[in-house]
Amino acid sequence: MRFSQDDEVLIKEAWGLLHQIPNAGGEALARMFSCYPGTKSYFPHFGHDFSANNEKVKHHGKKVVDAIGQGVQHLHDLSSCLHTLSEKHARELMVDPCNFQYLIEAIMTTIAAHYGEKFTPEINCAAEKCLGQIVHVLISLYR
């Protein structure tokens, strides 16, 4: 999928919003764990604390946000940019692909919770489009 110039501007704006939230990734993961408790099974090393304040959740959340940032910087070559991550999740970790959609929901909710009306429908749409493409790349090796 190609992103239009307008999409790219809005995606970068959405990324700017996400990136400004302290511990955005940890907060999004904690939301996902709360809404979809089955996702906790992939993170036994987190112990029993799946809150955004857990240092391990924060650390993994930062990895998630950094990976999204890499995707945003390489919108025209997401496959190459995210190939290693896709390989790891598909072959090594064997993450159920539906979990990526759960994470998208949690990320979008995190941005909306922090920015309200500033997270306009246009930015929301572009962010979903971008995250959807990132997920598409991440699950591409499952076939």
Curated annotation (Swiss-Prot):
Record has Transmembrane helix as a keyword: no
Gene3D superfamilies: Globins
Biological processes per GO annotation: hydrogen peroxide catabolic process
Keywords: Heme, Iron, Metal-binding, Oxygen transport, Transport
Tissue-specific expression: Red blood cells.
Residues binding O2, per UniProt: 60
Highest taxon above the source species: Eukaryota
Binding annotation for heme b: 89
Ranges for domain Globin: 2-143
Cellular compartments per GO CC: blood microparticle; haptoglobin-hemoglobin complex; hemoglobin complex
Transport in keyword set: yes
The family this protein is said to belong to: Belongs to the globin family.
General function of this protein: Involved in oxygen transport from the lung to the various peripheral tissues.
Name of the protein this chain belongs to: Hemoglobin subunit alpha
Organism this protein belongs to: Lepidosiren paradoxus (South American lungfish)
